[in-house]
Structure formats: C-alpha cells, structure tokens
A protein has these predicted regions:
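Active-site-proximal, substrate-binding regions of enzyme catalytic domains
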Residues: 1-4, 8-95
Length: 95
C-alpha cells in the first residue's frame, strides 16, 4: 500500500504524542520534499514533528517530478499541499 501524507497529520499526531499511529496503521508513509522541509527543516524544535519525522526510518521522502503541475496548484495551495497531491498522483498512491 502506498500512503502519501502532507504536513498536518505529521505535526498533529506528533503534538499529541501519537506519531507512532501512522506507522501502526500504514507501516510506511511517503512525503514530498516540501513536506519534509516544512516538518523538519523549518519545523519548530518543540511541538512540531522535526524529531519524529527525521528519526522515523519508515517515513520516505521523495521529490516530485512534475514541477509544472505543482506550480499550477500554487495558485490555490501552499507548496507542501501541492507537492503532496502531485506526488500521490505520480506514485498512484492508495491513500
């Protein structure tokens, strides 16, 4: 099963101490590079998902190939959301 996540579930579950639920339910998840950047690079040290995402071997970070499709979505969405949608399409994600 291919699962692609955006930043909100990562930070939300990390903030309540239940980041592990993603692994328990899905095994592995895939995130776009922009999601990684939001959660880890720009993430807050406390209350975010920096520690959880960077330490999870079951979270895979993948770069989106179709940059033009991402650019089109940026009129309505932020970069993390746009990359997540395009990555899910590129990988034929189940979730």
């Amino acid at each position: 099963m291919i699962v692609v996540s955006n930043t909100t579930p990562l930070i939300g579950l990390a903030s309540i101490g239940r980041f592990d639920l993603l692994h328990a339910i899905f095994g592995e998840i895939t995130i776009a590079q922009a999601v990684y950047d939001e959660a880890v690079v720009a993430g807050r040290k406390e209350g975010g998902a920096k520690r959880e995402v960077s330490g999870a071997t079951w979270v895979n970070t993948v770069s989106v190939r179709d940059r033009l499709a991402v650019e089109v979505l940026l009129d309505e969405l932020d970069l993390g959301e746009a990359e997540t949608i395009i990555l899910a399409r590129e990988l034929h994600a189940d979730w």
